[in-house]
Amino acid sequence: MTARYQSTKVFQGFSTAFRQWRAEGTHCAYLHGYDVFFKVWFEGEPDHRNWVWDFGGMSRCQGTIDGMSPRAWMDHLLDHTVLAAEDDPELDMLRELDRRGVLQLRVLPAVGAEALARHLQERLDAFVAAETAGRVRVVRVEFFENERNSAIYEP
């Protein structure tokens, strides 16, 4: 059996609001916010320092996500933002509020803890694989709405 090395990192400090329009009949259909955070699992062979992933690597990396450093990308996506699905029937109104400076809108294919776990895993995995020439992969992301509710995505 081949040994597998994993390390984890928690990213926190994001105040994020959601609109889950498909959650009809529940209070989650309304705009609501959380102090969200997420945990990332890195897997790969240790480097010359015996590290799978540099715990400060998101700050010291060379690559970018959408033209931003990884931490700036995380802040852009999650810090003091409103997340809405691309098929939200009120998207035009939310875009107008964004245009007026009332909110910072981020439009994603889907929203919710499960959708965010997947989105983060896919984007971070592509970044980390490129940054490490394929030596390390992001194999799991757990997204927390709060300390009691989370969703995990593993491809």
PLM ranges: what are they?
Residues 1-155:
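Charge-rich, low-complexity N-terminal segments
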